[in-house]
Amino acid sequence: MYLNTISPMKKSNHSSKRKGRGIGSGKGKTSGRGHKGQRSRSGGKVRRGFEGGQMPLYRRLPKFGHNKSKKSFFKKEIKLSEFMKIKDSFIDLIVLKKNKIINSKIKIVKIIFSKNFNKKINIKNLKVSKNAKKEIEFFGGTIN
């Protein structure tokens, strides 16, 4: 058996109807388009959602869905456990960027509580949640 000798099974391939080839073909004269009207003409399609000039459904209904705000691209929340990776005890935005915990676009950082933390750190110019603040102060850290 070779690829060039393989042929489809009998009656598995039907030849397509040739339109506009006489009355006897069943698709002659108007070629299955009916008589007159926009859809019988060449290029006579209407765009998706078009309702004949009536206000379409997608414009009658209100908009919905959630669009991510631009602010979210510049904000980040960091768990306290992330600071265990940093050797510095003084932490601010520059130190976080240097240690690749946040990317260069981030401008606002909030520190949130997590259990795996036991280090004295000094935080400057970062937002801190209530529980994270308690935890930092418990281990002798400060927040400016």
UniProtKB/Swiss-Prot annotation:
InterPro entries on file: Ribosomal_uL15, Ribosomal_uL15/eL18, Ribosomal_uL15/eL18_sf, Ribosomal_uL15_bac-type
GO biological process: translation
Superkingdom of the source species: Bacteria
Location of the region described as Disordered in the Swiss-Prot/TrEMBL record: 1-52
Biased composition, class Basic residues, residue ranges: 11-21, 30-47
Coiled-coil zones: none
Key words of the record: Ribonucleoprotein, Ribosomal protein, RNA-binding, rRNA-binding
GO molecular function ontology, one term from the record: structural constituent of ribosome
UniProt GO cellular component terms: cytosolic large ribosomal subunit
Its job: Binds to the 23S rRNA.
SUBUNIT field: Part of the 50S ribosomal subunit.
Family statement drawn from the similarity comment of this UniProt entry: Belongs to the universal ribosomal protein uL15 family.
Protein name: Large ribosomal subunit protein uL15
Source organism: Wigglesworthia glossinidia brevipalpis
